[in-house]
A protein has these predicted regions:
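Mature catalytic core of soluble alpha/beta enzymes
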Residues: 1-263
Length: 263
């Protein structure tokens, strides 16, 4: 969304009119609508205006260089925005129409979707493959001389330190954390995970959530939905989706079984 000539940026500028889109973007939007329903709206790509208002109005490199300077859009109270349910997908004609005033941010699903596609291309010859896209990981096959893949869980309280580890036999693993993309706005700490119910950065009490699922986009989406919704969102998980949450005291909770915890 930070590239003015990207397909997503062009779509955001076309709100209110039908726009032709590529097969890939159409598939991302279709899956996004399915996940929006499955998470009862906790995953909502239409929160871009709230992200900008919170100060995430440019890339993290620019934000860090800017420091505590005012964002392009001044901080303000959340304002009503169109519901994601109002977007229209014309699958046969490969076109999309968003209501006026809607802006999309697909960062909550696109990285996982792309990483899994990359892994499948790399493993087309049948070899085992692991792709790590900045914390979003997808595994195909089995590692050499091992049955499962070993995954380290970073401690969100101490960057670059490991809190625990677990194993998976394949599929996707994604982690969302309120400590990864942070900045200050008017002296107030902010992060990039917007609660669609309030329009503000989420405050569920969990610092990070790691999710294992058959597909990486699924893990990506539910990691964010759980981090935003907290324990109340756990019943929304499909049976084949497991998670591990870390709170402010470093305590672990979830259905994903760690094989070791570093004290």
């Amino acid at each position: 969304r930070f590239l003015p000539d990207s397909e997503l940026s062009q779509l955001n500028r076309s709100a209110g009119a039908w726009a032709d889109v590529s097969d890939d973007l159409l598939d991302l939007l279709r899956q996004s609508m399915d996940f929006w329903r499955a998470t009862h709206g906790l995953f909502d790509p239409s929160i871009l205006s709230d992200l900008k208002r919170a100060g995430y109005d440019r890339s993290m490199d620019d934000i860090r260089a800017r420091g505590d300077q005012p964002p392009t859009i001044p901080a303000s109270l959340p304002t009503p925005r169109p519901s994601f349910s109002e977007i229209e997908l014309d699958l046969p004609r490969k076109r999309v129409r968003m209501p006026r005033g809607m802006e999309l941010d697909l960062g909550g699903i696109a990285k996982g979707w792309i990483a899994e596609h990359a892994a499948r291309v790399l493993a087309a010859d049948g070899e085992a493959c692991a792709v790590n896209a900045g914390g979003d990981m997808y595994f195909l096959g089995h590692p050499a001389d091992e049955d499962d893949w070993l995954v380290d869980l970073e401690d969100p309280r101490e960057p670059n330190s490991i809190l625990a580890a677990f194993t998976v036999d394949g599929g996707g693993v994604a982690t969302s954390s309120v400590r990864k993309r942070t900045w200050t706005q008017g002296g107030q700490a902010r992060h990039h995970l917007i609660d669609p119910r309030t329009g503000n950065p989420s405050q569920s009490g969990w610092l990070s959530v790691t999710v294992s699922a058959p597909h990486l986009a699924t893990a990506d989406v539910f990691a964010k939905a759980l981090l935003i919704g907290g324990g109340q969102a756990v019943p929304l998980l499909p049976p084949d989706v497991l998670f591990l949450a870390v709170d402010a005291d470093g305590q672990l909770a979830g259905t994903l079984q760690p094989i070791g915890v570093i004290e």
